Each structure stands twice: as C-alpha cells, then as structure tokens.
Amino acid sequence: MKEYKLENIRNFSIIAHIDHGKSTIADRLLESTSTVEQREMREQLLDSMDLERERGITIKAHPVTMYYNYNGEVYQLNLIDTPGHVDFSYEVSRSLAACEGALLIVDAAQGVQAQSLANVYLALERDLEIIPILNKIDLPAANPEKIRKQIEDYIGLDTTHAIACSAKTGEGISEILEAIINLIPPPTPPQETELKALIFDSHYDPYVGIMVYVRVISGEIKKGDRITFMATKGSAFEVLGVGAFLPEATLIEGSLRAGQVGYFIANLKKVKDVKIGDTVTTVKHPAKVPLDGFKEINPVVFAGIYPIDSSDFDTLKDALSRLQLNDSALTIEQESSHSLGFGFRCGFLGLLHLEIVFERIIREFDLDIIATAPSVIYKVVLKNGKTLLIDNPTAYPDPSIIEHMEEPWVHVNIITPQEYLSSIMNLCLDKRGVCLKTEMLDQHRLVLSYDLPLNEIVSDFNDKLKSVTKGYGSFDYRLGDYRKGAIIKLEILINDEPVDAFSCLVHRDKAEARGRSICEKLVDVIPQQLFKIPIQAAINKKVIARETIRALSKNVTAKCYGGDITRKRKLWEKQKKGKKRMKEFGKVSIPNTAFIEVLKID
C-alpha cells in the first residue's frame, strides 16, 4: 500500500435502488483510477457471483481500495459496496458505520425509490456526508432537474453539489471523484492508541480460512498480534496476515492503521465466530469500550428444504454447510417430515435471502430440492403463562391450552404512481394492512406508509405489488412489534390422513379460502386411484373445505352379454366392497409436483 496520510483517506459507500446503476458507476470509478487494467475490466466487477450479475443486485458487500492523483496529492479512496436489498439492512448499517460519506445514486428517469430511501435514512442517522448522483442522463426520459427537486423536497438533502452523470458513457465520473475528495471528510484522528476495528463483513476462503473485513478506527493491526472480539467476548486469536482490496484481496507488508479499510486472517474456523458489527482489539492493550451499534442477526423467515431424491440428503447437508461458511445469517437445523422424508429447517433474513440460497443450491451443487412454504416466528401464549416461539406448523400446541397467539408486524413504505393508489390500498386491505399516512413525493408519485403482518409480506406481496402497479411500485419494510392475531393451524388430510408438508399457520379470516385453494389444486395434481380419495382442509378436526378425486372406473360387466340384471348387480356389489376395502388399506402416493404446485398458490 502507498504512503499513509490520514487526511488523504476517504471512506465512502454507494446507496442505490436495484437497477439504478450502482455497480456500473463502481466499474467506471475503478477504470478512472486505473485500479483495474482495461484488459481485465468486465461489467459489474465487484459483483463476483453469477447470480448477482444476472439479477443486477449486490448480495455480498465488496470493498475496494483505489488511489487517485488530485492537485499533486495521492488520495486513498476506500469504496465499501453494500447490498441494496431490505433483507440485508443490518449489513448495510454496519458498512455505512465504516464510512464518512456516501454517494446516493438516483436514476434520472425513474427518480427516488423505496429501498434507496430506507438506506439514505440509515446514512443520515450515521451523520454521513451524502452526495446525490443523478445517473442515466443519457436516457431520453431523463429529467435531472425534476429528480433534483424530488431529492430536496422529500429527503431534505441539499442538491447544490448534485452531479449529473452517465455511467454508460463515462460522463461526470471525474466530477464524482473530485466531489469524494472535496466533500467527504477524512477519518477523524483517533483519541486513543489502543486497537479498535469495526467488522463489517467476513468471507470464507478455502485456502486461507476466514477473512475478516475491518475498518480500523484507532490503533493498528499487524501480523503476529493477538486479538479478540469485544462484543462476543470470544477466545484470543493470532493474526496470520493483513491485506487490502486492490481490487482483489491481497496480503500486504506492515499494518492496517487508523482510517484504513482492509482484512486480516487468523486461525478462525467458522464464519459464525465472527459477528458483523463486533469490535476487534488486542489482548495486550485492549480498548476500554467497544464500538456501538452491535446486535445479533436473527433469521426472520423460515422454510424447510428437502431433497427430491432422498439419497441426496448428505449432498444437501454438505451444500448448506458450505453456503453457511459465507453466510452467518443462514441457520440450519435437521428435521424430518412424514411426507417429504429427511431435510432441513432453514432460517433466512427475508424472502430474497431464501430465493438466493435456494437458487445457489440448485446451480452450484446441481441438486433437485423442494422448499416448503415460508413461515415467520409466532408467539404462542399458553394458559399457564408460558410463551412459546414457533416457526413450524408441526410445533403448534394443542389449541385447548393456548391463551392467544401473537404475530410479527412490519412498517412498510410503498412508492407508487398516483393512478395505482386505489389498487394498492385494496391490496394492503386484503393483506390486513393498517394505513398510517399518505404523502406526495412529487406531482405524480405518492409514498404510502402501512403496518402489515410479516406473514403477508413474505408470501407474495412483492409480486402482487408489481402486478397492480405494472412494475412501477417499490417498497421497503422494517420489523415492528408483535400483535395479537387469530392465527390457527390449517391441516390438509388426504384419504383421512393428515399430510404435514401441506399444513400451515394462517389467519382465521383466510383459512377457508386457503384451504379451498389447496384442495382444488391437489385434485388436479394427484393421480386417480381405483378408489375415491377425499381431500379435506380442517381446523382443529373440523372440516372447512373438501374435494374428492373420483375413482377410476373399471367395467366389471363387460363380459355379461345381455342376460339377467341381477348378475350385473352382483358384480357391481362385489366391486363396491373391494373398493371400500382398498380405501381402508390403500396408500395414496403424492407426486413431488403436488408439493411444488401448492407452494405456487397465492
């Protein structure tokens, strides 16, 4: 690394809604600072996963150090790229805590969107210097002045220093680099000499083990130091090496000092040992108080993941363990289902997190898997005063001992064009939402604030919102509190046998509609047998919906040519008795497609 001057360091992040050009601007900055040679350049360089490139999103935070000559001085610019999605908001808040400034990228044609709003508020809470960037000015629909006014009116940011640019053509990129140097302050000189470093991410490398990404606040960290983690009060570890992101992770001689961003490797075995937001200090001269803001990340959404072929169980176990090495928020617990066999109960930060894990298992490990319907954590308050936390219908206790149920609610902000207001209000009403306020964002768009049950969000809220707003609506949410709710267990019985994989916890008002739609779907996907099969939806043993798969009919009187009707009746009676016995002892085989089809039900 080049000469160290604290006043020449700039640590910044990029805040943007999905598809507003964050990764492309990062590419242009890397090009302009010659961090990456032209022949090695490719689109979305910091997005290392194929999934990130395809979806146009950032899943893991990717830091990079750039050097830029300006007015005869060399400046060290540390970009800490952050995930943009609401599922990863804690990671975003820790990445922002490692910075002094942020670039707010807004599409000059689309304007401010919900997820960029959420992250701007996180940056404002940290008192960061925010530079608005109006991207995509090369588009015919771009209206930078209108978007500038939108940022001033709704977010309350001064847009005097806003920069209009086009990441596609490279226009305005040098102005962005100059603004980073002139407007974002350097790190504050440390008041203490003891090591304090903020962990903002970690990564498992098969060759060197766990790489811990840090921003050094005070002191320095170097090879040979014995360090410990303050919030989790873990064991002591020896630092085996320190490095920087140039842009690839590269080991360096010397140390990481106050204000710098880099990583260290130690003899750490699991990512779970490293908590994002924790403070690193030395054993010899420990810091007195840790950095504030640390909290444990707990999963919010749960789902069962099962292999379609039961012989793939060990491969699935290995796949999940490997994913967990790089994803400390993913929780795994072995479980078994009467219908699906052995699998895993997994916890996720949100629906996008679930989708990403599901997709990575299929792609990277070539496995065929089934995921059960996503569920949230409910509180069950029992009559004896105890409280249970359940995320699985199989853990639902006997209804006679339940005092009441509580479900998690979230605060939701929806940004939409005005003409879709009534459609969104109907959608939120259908999802049991409570309207808090409606504000104008500009002449054409509104911000709606709602309280909604989390269970309604994790099912299909995003798809329905995109559908009713023709793709123009966006939303973000943050966890609120628990509230009483009439949550009940809906059981599905096939041939009078309950099938646990189809059971779910639903609100009483929606139970009948949900039960009916599952029964109707199963009638279409379960093949006919020689006996009729009843499919029932039941609550507490009371059937609320029923469909019947008709028996395959076999013509037992085909050999009777004319003749006496009593002969035919005797054969029909014998057939009826046989079918009755088959119904008692016959097993209904449920195809895998049935489980997948039920998951598709809204």
Curated annotation (Swiss-Prot):
GO molecular function annotations of the record: GTP binding; GTPase activity; ribosome binding; translation elongation factor activity
Domain tr-type G: 7-188
Entry's EC annotation: 3.6.5.n1
Binding of GTP, residues: 19-24, 135-138
Protein's membrane topology: Peripheral membrane protein
Keywords linked to the UniProt accession: Cell inner membrane, Cell membrane, GTP-binding, Hydrolase, Membrane, Nucleotide-binding, Protein biosynthesis
GO terms for cellular component: plasma membrane
Catalyzed reaction equations: GTP + H2O = GDP + phosphate + H(+)
Function summary: Required for accurate and efficient protein synthesis under certain stress conditions. May act as a fidelity factor of the translation reaction, by catalyzing a one-codon backward translocation of tRNAs on improperly translocated ribosomes. Back-translocation proceeds from a post-translocation (POST) complex to a pre-translocation (PRE) complex, thus giving elongation factor G a second chance to translocate the tRNAs correctly. Binds to ribosomes in a GTP-dependent manner.
PANTHER family: TRANSLATION FACTOR GUF1 HOMOLOG, CHLOROPLASTIC, TRANSLATION FACTOR GUF1-RELATED
Family in the record: Belongs to the TRAFAC class translation factor GTPase superfamily. Classic translation factor GTPase family. LepA subfamily.
Name the UniProt record assigns to this protein: Elongation factor 4
